[in-house]
Amino acid sequence: MQSFFTQWISRWIFSTNHKDIGTLYLIFGAFSGVLGGCMSMLIRMELAQPSNHLLLGNHQIYNVLITAHAFLMIFFMVMPVMIGGFGNWLVPIMIGSPDMAFPRLNNISFWLLPPSLCLLLMSALVEVGVGTGWTVYPPLSSIQSHSGGAVDLAIFSLHISGASSILGAVNFISTILNMRSPGQSMYRIPLFVWSILVTAFLLLLAVPVLAGAITMLLTDRNFNTSFFDASGGGDPILYQHLFWFFGHPEVYILILPGFGMISHIVSTFSRKPVFGYIGMVYAMVSIGVLGFIVWAHHMYTVGLDVDTRAYFTAATMIIAVPTGIKIFSWIATIWEGSIHLKTPMLFAIGFIFLFTIGGLTGIVLANSGLDISLHDTYYVVAHFHYVLSMGAVFAIFAGFYYWFGKITGLQYPETLGQIHFWSTFIGVNLTFMPMHFLGLAGMPRRIPDYPDAYAGWNLIASYGSYIALFSTLFFFYIVFVSLTSNNPCTNFPWEFNKSKTYGVSTLEWIVTSPPAYHTFEEMPLIYETKSN
């Protein structure tokens, strides 16, 4: 018994194996996603009808729920699953490396997250919680308005989570730049690896700015400085500039790994190489660069000069160009392909469709004149949930079904996966499509009560969220069924046409399912073959 326990501790607590750490990230992300999902359910139940009922008129609690929902979903669900989970599992295998460059750094990157999560949950439970929204703007987050320790706990939580992200980013950058197998140039690495590389650079540059901003907020609250306190000569708008200089690259950090995953899936299920590989790479890099010079489009209403607003409007619209290149390249990949509509492909097509809608509403919001009336309405909520709740999350589901057999060695039941896709698709669209109409009608964000005129669309949105909830529960049932069924997965489960053998484009389909504890006993040699 003792030896089993020590083995378990050394394997899972002191792990230096990229696959085990990736598994830990996936489990952690699923747990946090459930917590965040419960909070969104509470929000939608409160908003199902006008007037106060579920939260008994306690508007502070409502804002605490919204803040915690955002932090959980962004920092503890999407980032750990995409970068930590899929990134750790797949990047070393795809580049033919035995492990990450710094395996123990990888371990601490993960183990910083559970304490960070605990601090975040504590911040919601002490005093009156953090009712500031995820942006934590002063003066609402100042010591006068949030006098308890809740905001300080949230700040510490973000510090630790940010440290985890930076360490992980350093690890990915050095792994991808230094540990590729012989014959694998940068222009031969898979698009998912490129997406993780760009994401890691974004993290490395953006997160320290957030750390600086929240550290100044911490000293404003506790040590009598006045960085953001106008009465002491500070400027609360400075905080907004610092926060959004991090916050805008952050949304690209959330979606870029998804772009990489979708490229692989669309290519596999269309039986074609990705259309315009080099263009895809340059598009991702340009999105990463442009993401840093558009931050003030979140701040059109704070009184920026008109020429400043004109610049940020133009720059924001330019980002649509590389994004459009990616979308049209995916469509060109599907075009004339031999399409197989398995669950990962359904989620990928859903991703392309819904992400495009989210991108179009983003173009609308880029206009500073229009944004004055749409700012802080449900139109903005609809926009970023189309990009995140149907972009990032659909990419996660697509990647999960695509690589599930490879990671576990067991294949999921296809019919159940398709039911999960359709129920999720209907649920999220029913939830977020009405929010566009509410926003155009002027319903403000972060307010738990609303005039009766908005009741109809809100009820529909709440019903949609209940459908999405049940489809998520169904997803966990699928995972349970898959893991308990004895349905082994072949090395390459997506071989549909047995008579003609296709080459596989990436290394993970060459190794066994699941891969050995040490994937490569010797370095693979990568070279190009001419296709007939």
Swiss-Prot record:
There is a cross-link at residues 248-252 (1'-histidyl-3'-tyrosine (His-Tyr)). O2 binds at residue 252. GO terms for cellular component: mitochondrial inner membrane; respiratory chain complex IV. Fe(II)-heme a binds at residues 69, 385. Its cofactor is heme; Cu cation. GO terms for molecular function: cytochrome-c oxidase activity; heme binding; metal ion binding. Binds 2 heme A groups non-covalently per subunit. Its EC number is 7.1.1.9. It catalyses: 4 Fe(II)-[cytochrome c] + O2 + 8 H(+)(in) = 4 Fe(III)-[cytochrome c] + 2 H2O + 4 H(+)(out). Pathway: Energy metabolism; oxidative phosphorylation. Disulfide bonds: none annotated. The keyword Glycoprotein does not apply. InterPro entries: Cyt_c_oxase-like_su1_dom, Cyt_c_oxase-like_su1_sf, Cyt_C_Oxase_1, Cyt_c_Oxase_su1_BS, Cyt_c_oxase_su1_dom, Cyt_c_oxidase_su1_bac. Cu cation binds at residues 248, 297-298. It is found in: Mitochondrion inner membrane. Heme a3 binds at residue 383. Mg(2+) binds at residues 375-376. Belongs to the heme-copper respiratory oxidase family. Component of the cytochrome c oxidase, the last enzyme in the mitochondrial electron transport chain which drives oxidative phosphorylation. The respiratory chain contains 3 multisubunit complexes succinate dehydrogenase (complex II, CII), ubiquinol-cytochrome c oxidoreductase (cytochrome b-c1 complex, complex III, CIII) and cytochrome c oxidase (complex IV, CIV), that cooperate to transfer electrons derived from NADH and succinate to molecular oxygen, creating an electrochemical gradient over the inner membrane that drives transmembrane transport and the ATP synthase. This is Cytochrome c oxidase subunit 1. It comes from Chondrus crispus.
